[in-house]
């Protein structure tokens, strides 16, 4: 049975990696990311290959702290969140992803870590409804607490659903960012022994598509300039222990005032995992 599951993930990796016009049929995929642009950063050039894909944004991309809203040029957080959603829908539309394929859990940016239980429960419901063969999501790497919270929720939701699925969905990862020696690393993975990386060198047409998708995110231009256009990377998700740091040393988000530090995050993960497993996710 496990070989069958792995082959579905391998099939998706082959589909994402192929540079030809016809990569073949992709498995049924749900993309689950923390913010409305993370899927474009990590997989924008390949989303058009995922026919019928469902995209889930865990947060609305708007922190509650008013400074973020004002710096982005909006009077309220709701206006900022609405703009981020419209930017993302425009970008996804370029890849053939329709608005009805996109779902919002609508938690505030920087608050996913404090909502691990409700997020996991929502994902259990959605995965049960959609029944994907593969979930594409963030890795656990200490880059952004919302990214790590999303990874936690995906892995825990899959664990809670194992008894219901004949073939539980394979979890694959797209890239975001993390810190190495105090320097940001983008569009690559924190190494995990035994888990190889599929590197995709994008064609000229694919780079142009991704550039046009990036251009849709007017509010995020300063952020997106950190991410290269020419390459995307994917891998099978390792078996994480979310109660331990993803790497030694200072985590990327610990350099910023993003509402939480690593020790507190891991305490919340431990508490949420214990409660969810003891209650069966209910």
Regions found by a protein language model. Give the residues of each.
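Metal-dependent de-N-acetylase/amidase catalytic core
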Residues: 1-32, 50, 99, 112-282
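ATP-dependent adenylation/pyrophosphate-handling site
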Residues: 18, 22-79
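Short beta-strand segments
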Residues: 56-57, 106, 172-175
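A conserved beta-strand->alpha-helix junction
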Residues: 58, 94-107
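Flexible loop residues that form catalytic
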Residues: 61, 107, 140
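A short acidic, glycine-rich active-site loop
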Residues: 74-83, 196-201
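Short, solvent-exposed amphipathic alpha-helices that sit
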Residues: 80-95, 153-157
């Amino acid at each position: 049975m496990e070989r069958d599951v792995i082959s579905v993930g391998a099939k998706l990796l082959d589909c994402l990696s192929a540079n030809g016009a016809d990569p073949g049929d992709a498995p049924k995929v749900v993309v689950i990311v923390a913010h409305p642009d993370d899927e474009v950063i990590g997989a924008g050039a390949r989303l058009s290959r995922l026919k019928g894909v469902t995209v889930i944004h865990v947060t609305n991309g708007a922190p509650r702290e008013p400074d973020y809203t004002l710096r982005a040029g909006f009077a309220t957080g709701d206006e900022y969140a609405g703009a981020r959603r419209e930017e993302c829908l425009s970008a996804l539309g370029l890849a053939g992803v329709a608005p009805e394929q996109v779902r919002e859990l609508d938690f505030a940016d920087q608050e996913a870590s404090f909502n691990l239980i409700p997020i996991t429960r929502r994902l259990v419901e959605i995965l049960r409804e959609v029944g994907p063969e593969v979930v594409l999501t963030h890795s656990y790497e200490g880059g952004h607490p919302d990214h790590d919270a999303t990874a936690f929720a995906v892995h825990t939701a899959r664990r809670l659903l194992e008894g219901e699925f004949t073939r539980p969905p394979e979890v694959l990862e797209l890239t975001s960012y993390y810190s190495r020696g105090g320097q940001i690393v983008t569009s690559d993975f924190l190494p995990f022994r035994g888990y190889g990386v599929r590197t995709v060198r994008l064609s000229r047409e694919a780079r142009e598509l991704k550039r046009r998708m990036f251009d849709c995110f007017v509010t995020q231009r300063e952020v997106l300039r950190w991410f290269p256009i020419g390459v995307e990377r994917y891998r099978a998700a390792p078996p994480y222990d979310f109660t331990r740091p993803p790497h030694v040393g200072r985590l990327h988000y610990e350099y910023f005032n993003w509402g939480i530090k690593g020790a507190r995050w891991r305490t919340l993960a431990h508490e949420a995992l214990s409660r969810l497993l003891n209650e069966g996710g209910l």
